[in-house]
Amino acid sequence: MGLLDFLKSKKNTAETAKNRLQIIIAQERNHRGGPDYLPLMQRELLEVIKKYVNIDADAVRVDLVKDGEHDVLDISVALPEDGDK
């Protein structure tokens, strides 16, 4: 029984790794077609937000989304639940 549990956990780990890689690839595809200023904007937004809240670099996401005729700048900030500063 212990051996079966061990093998099952490896499958879950592999599935998790696969899902993470798919997310990274999708994000890279989104950034490839965007303007050159988006990465700089993301870093600057992170610096400003860090003045008020303690967050990781991965907490700020900036994407440019095409919505018909318009380009929409989508900014997502994952704030900590405890209001840490």
UniProtKB/Swiss-Prot annotation:
UniProt entry keywords in alphabetical sequence: Cell cycle, Cell division
Stated name of the protein: Cell division topological specificity factor
The source organism is Xanthomonas oryzae pv. oryzae (strain KACC10331 / KXO85)
Q: Which NCBIfam families match?
A: minE, PRK00296.1
Tell me the superkingdom of the source: Bacteria
Q: Biological process GO terms, please? A: cell division; regulation of division septum assembly
Q: So what does this one do?
A: Prevents the cell division inhibition by proteins MinC and MinD at internal division sites while permitting inhibition at polar sites. This ensures cell division at the proper site by restricting the formation of a division septum at the midpoint of the long axis of the cell.
Q: Which family does the similarity line name?
A: Belongs to the MinE family.
Give the taxonomic lineage as stored in the record. Bacteria, Pseudomonadati, Pseudomonadota, Gammaproteobacteria, Lysobacterales
